[in-house]
Amino acid sequence: MDDYVFAPPERVSVKVLETKKRFAVNRVFCVGRNYAEHAIEMGFHPNRDKPFYFTNSPSAVIPSGSRICYPEATDNFHHEMELVIAIGYGGSKILPYRALSHIFGYACGLDMTRRDLQISLRERGYPW
């Protein structure tokens, strides 16, 4: 056994429906401002303010049916339904007609955001 200064995080995985297998979550890539109607709701213009990309920790992935605690110091804990695409294997410079062959499967995700904190940071020019 290795002698870690800090214990490494447990491997995050999700159950693959109708099997006994699990899908390991290595990285979480996200796209923000990718739905025009929602961008407008958030005060952005879809033709001017382009989508952006960010990552999230695999530890943010929790199993379906898990309890989510309402965080302290927020008055606006906002939910959004997300389309989750599980990548089966990677690559680079993938031709559009081959892209679907890299997808393992799809799922629904629930993105929870402290919207009041997000807006406050955005107004001060900070990343959220």
PLM feature segments, named:
Residues 1-128:
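Catalytic-core "active-site belt" of small-molecule-metabolizing enzymes
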